[in-house]
């Protein structure tokens, strides 16, 4: 078995609670600016999260929930692009100094940097949104902490397809067995598994009841020394928080 050489993180819901606290409010603010009377409730947004990608989510919503909506110039593609650009503007404003990292994320990232374990991101989120979050929640140079940021439309098909993970692996010049993925959702788990990656799940309010069959671990968070995680599935031995030692143990398991 090869050594653990890289951690590949999802972003939304994994690094931070951005789905609940930034993306959904940003969509609703974009709808207001566009003069639309749409509002995505917490419950509805949970359903829409089954669709990977913001633009794809808007398109699905229009087709499934607003089928009688008069699309400007009958150009759905351009309507979706424009609305998503407005949403991204609001997202960037919302994350500045407002969205903290989830427990254990900064500690694990810093430990990986110290020990020479490479860091990458694999997400359906727009690259500008990822950059805004990393700069605000990690450090002004946060994006540079990650050797590869595979995001948004860099790949043709989004999660649950494996394309974004395959892109990250190729950019790292690593094999799946060299890496561990950290995700928060069923869709993300399917993508990572299809790319051949062992995966750790940290659930959130939107995803805690999803099917995580095949994950190495399912946790409520990565935890901290003074804020132990809750193990929902898997074997952590005596560990009370997720660190590189535990990551390496999982990586070595057959």
Task: Name each region found by the language model.
Residues 2-11, 15-103, 110, 114-115:
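N-terminal helical cap/lid subdomain that shapes the substrate entry/recognition surface
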Residues 2-3, 110, 126-254:
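Asp-based, Mg2+/Mn2+-dependent phosphohydrolase catalytic module
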Residues 14, 123-125:
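Conserved phosphate-coupling serine/threonine residues in phosphotransfer and NTP-handling enzymes
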Residues 117-119:
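A structural preference for short, pocket-lining loop segments at secondary-structure junctions
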Residues 21, 39, 74, 99, ...:
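Non-catalytic, surface-exposed connector residues within folded enzymatic/regulatory domains
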């Amino acid at each position: 078995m090869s050594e653990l050489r890289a951690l590949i993180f999802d972003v939304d819901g994994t690094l931070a609670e951005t789905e609940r606290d930034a993306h959904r409010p940003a969509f609703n603010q974009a709808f207001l600016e566009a003069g639309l009377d749409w509002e995505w409730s917490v419950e509805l947004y949970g359903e829409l999260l089954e669709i990977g990608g913001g633009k794809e989510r808007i398109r699905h919503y229009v087709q499934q929930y607003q089928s009688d909506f008069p699309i400007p110039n009958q150009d759905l593609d351009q309507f979706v692009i424009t609305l998503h650009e407005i949403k991204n503007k609001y997202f960037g404003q919302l994350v500045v100094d407002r969205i903290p990292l989830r427990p254990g994320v900064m500690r694990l990232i810093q430990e990986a940097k110290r020990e020479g374990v490479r860091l990458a991101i694999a997400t359906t989120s727009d690259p500008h949104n990822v950059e805004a979050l990393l700069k605000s929640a990690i450090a002004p140079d946060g994006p540079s902490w990650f050797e590869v940021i595979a995001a948004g439309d860099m790949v043709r098909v989004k999660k649950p397809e494996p394309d974004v993970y395959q892109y990250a692996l190729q950019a790292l010049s690593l094999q799946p067995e060299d890496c561990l993925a950290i995700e928060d959702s069923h869709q993300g788990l399917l993508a990572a598994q299809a790319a051949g990656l062992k995966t750790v799940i940290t659930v959130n309010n939107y995803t805690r009841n999803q099917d995580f069959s095949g994950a190495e671990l399912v946790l409520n968070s990565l935890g901290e020394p003074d804020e132990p995680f809750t193990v929902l599935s898997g074997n952590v031995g005596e560990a009370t928080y997720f660190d590189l030692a535990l990551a390496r143990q999982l990586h070595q398991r057959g």
